[in-house]
């Protein structure tokens, strides 16, 4: 029964990411973003930013959509401030910026969840697969609140704690993480 509940949480996370992929597909083909790519003019960038805001509002799992034009180095964001310096993107957490070395992840042939963190803040990013021949990149900041809600839905009837962890056992999000942390310290990466 517990395994079934945990499986349901995993399925919900998978559904949430599938919804982000659907937004990504729609956004990649959105005429406003296409025009902003080929006619780097303020009006088209404004229209593209408006569409990104609409897509962000329509999916609560997305906190921010970030669109990067790789030709012009222009950045559009539907929420958090993002800038680029020396090839590194910096994403504002609400108190300071976390570095995101996106180029380290673009050679993958898979979509990726990327956890950025320091001593005081963290962000979970979703970077959909993007071929290196594309002239743009889009990544998504996942809503910490909605991720937490998804994990909380599985925390009833015998499940006292649940968390999403990185491959090196850092907790991305969870409920009652203090009870599970001692077990994570003893896990060996497979």
PLM features: what roles do these ranges have?
Residues 73, 133, 169-171:
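Residue-level signal for well-ordered, solvent-exposed loop/turn and beta-edge residues enriched
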Residues 90-96, 117-155, 173:
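Conserved beta-strands of PAS-like sensory domains
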Residues 21, 62, 134-136, 154, ...:
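A structure-centric signal for secondary-structure junctions around beta-strands
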Residues 1-7, 35-40, 79-83, 107-115, ...:
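N-terminal sensory and localization modules of signal-transduction and trafficking proteins
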Residues 93-111, 185-190:
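Soluble sensory domains of the PAS superfamily and closely related sensory modules
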Residues 2-101:
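Extracytoplasmic/periplasmic sensory segments of membrane signal-transduction proteins
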Residues 82-84, 131, 178-180:
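Short, surface-exposed beta-strand-loop junctions and turns on beta-sheet-rich folds
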Residues 146-190:
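Intrinsic low-complexity, intrinsically disordered coil/linker regions enriched in small/polar
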């Amino acid at each position: 029964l517990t395994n079934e509940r945990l499986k349901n949480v995993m399925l919900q996370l998978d559904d949430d990411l599938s919804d982000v992929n659907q937004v990504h597909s729609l956004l990649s083909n959105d005429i406003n973003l296409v025009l902003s790519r080929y006619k780097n003019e303020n009006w088209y960038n404004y229209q593209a930013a408006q569409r990104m805001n609409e897509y962000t509002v329509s999916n609560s799992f997305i906190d921010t959509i970030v669109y990067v034009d790789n030709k012009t180095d222009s950045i559009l964001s539907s929420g958090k401030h993002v800038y680029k310096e020396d090839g590194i993107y910096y994403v504002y957490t609400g108190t300071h910026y976390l570095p995101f070395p996106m180029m380290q992840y673009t050679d993958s042939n898979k979509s990726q969840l990327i956890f950025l963190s320091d001593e005081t803040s963290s962000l979970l990013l979703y970077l959909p697969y993007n071929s290196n021949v594309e002239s743009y990149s889009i990544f998504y900041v996942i809503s910490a609140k909605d991720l937490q809600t998804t994990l909380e839905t599985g925390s009833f009837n015998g499940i006292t704690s649940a968390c999403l962890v990185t491959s090196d056992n850092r907790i991305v999000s969870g409920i009652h993480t203090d009870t599970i942390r001692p077990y994570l310290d003893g896990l060996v990466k497979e």
